[in-house]
From Swiss-Prot:
GO molecular function, one term: protein serine kinase activity
Superkingdom of origin: Eukaryota
Alphabetized SMART domains for the sequence: S_TKc
Keyword Nucleotide-binding: yes
Name of the protein in its database record: Probable serine/threonine-protein kinase WNK4
GO CC terms, sorted: cytoplasm
Family the UniProt entry places it in: Belongs to the protein kinase superfamily. Ser/Thr protein kinase family. WNK subfamily.
InterPro entries with a match to the protein in the record: Kinase-like_dom_sf, Kinase_OSR1/WNK_CCT, Prot_kinase_dom, Ser/Thr_kinase_AS, WNK_Ser-Thr_kinase
Pfam families: OSR1_C, Pkinase
KW Transmembrane (keyword) present: no
Ranges of residues in domain Protein kinase: 25-282
Binding site for ATP: 105-108, 155
């Protein structure tokens, strides 16, 4: 390759990196940041065009097999796809020295369609029809590919624009999947754009048509779908009941509204991309109606979506479990992810937590029965203000669960939070208002034993919402064994409890696999005995309340009691002391887990990046 000019004369502040072939020059200008990658502006010296240079830290990707799978899936798909309405792929390579994975794609001068639409709030109906046709052509290409490809996260954030000639292309295929079977199984996407059948874990490429309809709604109204909802649980409730977004009522053009409705009908009635391209609404361009003139040009704070929009990704038992527990003790940008699973003869609950920043955790709860029916709900947990009980109560209300499930779900959330965020002080709804209640002389419900708090002499840790003693010199395996013994409320004969498994560094292990000689089922919080569990209604019946777990009202335990009434004014110091002990013991446990994690990471690096 013959290049004219001197690279040394390029401003160092602008040119920061050159690819191994010296064809692409990366500038320091950041175009965007995603969940895994940073996108920079770059220049192709051969073609003389500007391109997009996506860069991912290998260490960050290697901590999560899920992230690695997504990255290589996107690269593989982009390499094989060639269509005028699908993002172009140019090249990719791994930089062993800088430990980065680099991908070169085409550059879109106007950013995403959402950004473009926000920048230009007044557009003619003809323009929206033009965008819609291009997106449908891209979807038709993906869906008729052999095998078919489902995007699964189609939204205006993932549709890109070259505004100088109105070109629109589908991009961000990191969550796309190849349809090797007639029906897909995993739940993944952005809640506001997810079709109802996605939550049921049984869907095909028509889920992209539903998402396309939501994209059309955003193009017309400049609003995110379901912006009237404050959380994902409310969105799930409306979607599962077939309630359309409130923004749909703001569309005054009857033909446009009818066209969007065709995309949002049940999957059995939904048209394909090819069929929608033949719709009379798109076949006619003789309209000069301006749209978007009376709608807000910014998204509500509660549903503001950045390039790092959350993705729901919960796989069924039929697929490989890819969630991991990864931690960044150096305070870097890596996200921590942890997953717990509780199973029973009737029900399986899977709670996945991802630490987004210092103050928020993204949680995904999956509730499934033996028949394969499942419900999935995604919600945010704010560490400085939310409590497990308040979030659980909201989930129970939105999902129409039984009231007795609030405590169980709250215990489940507390268990995950205290493991995901070392040192996090668990907030209690009652403790948050101690000052006002102490003045009134009211008592608080705290977790303790029948023994008086002042007589507690052992170290204690919080597991499943209960305090358990731990010998100071116990090893991690002894510690876990003591937890298993302590939480086996029903004794050796209680086989129908709740078991718990932890995903660590890509390998699914139960607690028994970490050095415990004898594994016993973990009971669920205060629930005890073989009669405590029972699914009263099938999960597929979304209109009626159902109980995840039933509490055995007659069951008691001689050592552990939930809800013992203790005065805050008398025992606040004791409570604070116990919380300090909890934090100290979990720190010790996490140090051991960190060591295990580092060993696993090193093994992964040696596997994927062998020394040359």
């Amino acid at each position: 390759m013959e290049v004219f000019g001197d690279l040394d004369k390029v401003d160092d502040a602008e040119c920061v990196e050159v690819d191994p072939t010296r064809r692409y020059i990366r500038y320091n200008e950041v175009l965007g940041r995603g969940a895994m990658k940073t996108v920079y502006k770059a220049f192709d010296e051969v073609e003389g065009i500007e391109v997009a240079w996506s860069q991912v830290e290998i260490d960050e990707v290697m901590q999560s097999p899920d992230n690695l799978e997504r990255l290589y899936s996107e690269v593989h798909l982009l390499k094989s796809l060639k269509h005028e309405n699908v993002m172009k792929f140019y090249n990719y390579w791994v930089d062993d020295q800088k430990k980065t994975i680099n991908v070169i794609t085409e550059l879109f001068t106007s950013g995403s369609l959402r950004q473009y639409r926000q920048k230009h709030p007044r557009v003619d109906l003809k323009a929206i029809k033009n965008w819609a046709r291009q997106v449908l052509r891209g979807l038709d290409y993906l869906h008729t590919h052999q095998p078919p490809i489902i995007h699964r996260d189609l939204k205006c954030d993932n549709i890109f624009v070259n505004g100088n000639h109105g070109e629109v292309k589908i991009g961000d295929l990191g969550l796309a999947t190849v349809m090797l079977t007639p029906r897909a199984k995993s739940v993944i996407g952005t809640p506001e754009f997810m079709a109802p059948e996605l939550y049921d874990e049984n869907y095909d490429e028509l889920v992209d048509i539903y998402s396309f309809g939501m994209c059309m709604l955003e193009m017309f109204t400049l609003e995110y779908p379901y912006s009237e909802c404050t959380n994902a649980a409310q969105i799930f409730k409306k979607v599962s009941k077939g309630v359309k977004p409130a923004a749909l009522a703001k569309i005054t053009n009857i033909q446009a509204k009818q066209f969007i409705d065709k995309c949002l009908v049940p999957a059995s009635e939904r048209l394909s991309a090819k069929e929608l391209l033949q719709d009379p609404f798109l076949c006619s361009d003789n309209s000069s109606v301006l749209v978007g003139t009376k709608f807000p040009s910014s998204l509500p704070k509660s549903v503001d979506v950045s390039l790092e929009a959350l993705h729901m990704d919960v796989d069924t038992n039929e697929s490989m479990c890819t969630s991991t527990c990864k931690r960044n003790d150096l305070g870097g940008p890596h996200r921590s992810v942890l997953e717990f699973t509780r199973t029973n003869k009737n029900t399986e609950l899977k709670l996945t937590g991802e630490k987004l920043d210092d103050n928020s955790v993204s949680l995904v709860l999956r509730i499934a029965d033996l028949c394969g029916h499942a419900r999935n709900i995604h919600f945010l947990f704010y560490l400085d203000s939310d409590t497990a009980m308040s979030v659980a109560a909201e989930m129970v209300e939105q999902l129409e669960l039984a009231d007795c499930d609030v405590t169980f779900i709250a215990d489940f959330i507390d268990l995950l939070i205290v493991n995901l965020v070392p040192g996090q002080q668990l907030m209690n709804d009652a403790v948050m208002s101690t000052s006002s209640e102490s003045k009134m002389g009211e008592s608080e419900h705290v977790i303790t034993s029948q023994q008086h708090p002042s007589e507690l002499t052992h170290d204690y840790v919080l597991v499943e919402g209960m305090m358990h003693s731990k010998e100071a010199n116990a090893s991690p395996s002894d510690y876990i064994d003591s937890l298993l013994n302590a939480t086996n409320l029903g004794g050796p004969n209680s086989s129908e409890g709740s078991d718990i498994s932890v995903q660590l560094d890509g390998s699914s292990k139960s607690l028994s696999e970490y050095g415990v000689d004898e594994y016993r089922t973990l009971e669920c919080g205060a629930y005890k005995g073989t009669d405590k569990l029972g699914c009263r209604h099938p999960l597929s019946n979304g209109s009626s309340n159902f109980a995840i777990f039933q509490m055995d009202q007659a069951s008691h335990h001689s050592e552990l009691v939930i809800g013992a009434s203790v005065s805050i004014t008398e025992n606040r110091d004791v409570l604070n002391g116990e919380l300090g002990l909890i934090e100290a013991q979990y720190e010790q446990w996490f140090r051991e887990l960190t060591r295990m994690r580092e060993e696993a990471l090193e093994g992964a690096r040696k596997k994927w990046l062998p020394d040359k």
